């Protein structure tokens, strides 16, 4: 039994990191596909498309949850792996931030279409901007000064994680008009007047979605291959 459990805490964290990556990217592809089908007004009637949209919103909680958990996990990993001697309070703070973010995401989802959800999302938006600045700053500082993160692949990975944050924020920004546009579609029915603006918004959002996918794959490549 001892031999079967012969693995380190760092190895366990790496395993969890891989699981979260799979859930993040895999579920997000599912969200993308549901969005693709929602766009097909010639194939589905409006009630069917609204069901697809509800499934999309529910499934989207998986990548959002994985994203929030990635923050404390990455900090804990670099500390446990000996890549960066993070003080205990820093690790604890990262888990506190992750817990708050997770609560905001799920509270907004449970109380959707309420002032409480709107408040949660505003706080989450500010939090994500702060985390974007943190990871971008960490990556740039490490690449320019050679610390606190080294080797180069790890510093680059931190920088790219910050870019993922930035692109994901742009997804939310680009998607924001969907609420009123969808409300108009439901109230007035399907027509070029209600469908075309919604389609344009979704097309713009898809650009940022593809950018996130590419950055996720590039980050995974760096973590696995460690090319430099």
PLM feature segments, named:
Residues 2-228:
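Polytopic transmembrane helical bundles with strong interfacial aromatic enrichment
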